[in-house]
């Protein structure tokens, strides 16, 4: 074995070039879920949401999501309006950038 043979990289399995199928969670109408865009952060786990039904709601980030997902202005989320106060909602899901692109291509996000 020569010194040149030692410097050659070993053949490793190349990553597959096939596109993987990822599932994107869509809002469920039976659970009263709606897509919304974060307009501004208000502090104390509250934010202003512009929902796809045209209503601007005050959103609340529940404790179960607080540490999992960092939400910023411009993010697309799924919100569930409160049954007794329609101008407030809970944020239950945050989309990543590739998921937002998929939602736009499929027509879930208007404009």
Curated annotation (Swiss-Prot):
User: Which HAMAP family does the entry mention?
Assistant: aIF_1A
**What's the protein here called?**
Translation initiation factor 1A 1
Record keywords, A-Z: Initiation factor, Protein biosynthesis
Chain coiled-coil ranges: none
* Ranges for region Disordered: 1-28
Q: What's this protein's family per the entry?
A: Belongs to the eIF-1A family.
Q: Where is the S1-like domain?
A: 22-96
Report the PROSITE patterns cross-referenced here.
IF1A, S1_IF1_TYPE
Show the GO MF annotations. Answer: RNA binding; translation initiation factor activity
User: Record's Pfam families?
Assistant: eIF-1a
Q: What does this protein do?
A: Seems to be required for maximal rate of protein biosynthesis. Enhances ribosome dissociation into subunits and stabilizes the binding of the initiator Met-tRNA(I) to 40 S ribosomal subunits.
């Amino acid at each position: 074995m020569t010194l040149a043979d030692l410097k050659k990289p070993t053949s490793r399995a190349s990553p597959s070039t096939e596109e993987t199928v990822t599932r994107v969670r869509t809002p469920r109408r039976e659970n009263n879920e709606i897509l919304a865009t974060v307009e501004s952060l208000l502090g104390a786990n509250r934010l202003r949401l512009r929902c796809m039904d045209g209503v601007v709601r005050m959103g609340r980030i529940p404790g179960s999501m607080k540490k999992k997902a960092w939400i910023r202005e411009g993010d697309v989320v799924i919100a569930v309006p409160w049954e007794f106060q329609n101008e407030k909602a809970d944020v239950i899901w945050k989309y990543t950038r590739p998921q937002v692109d998929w939602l736009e291509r499929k027509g879930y996000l208007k404009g």
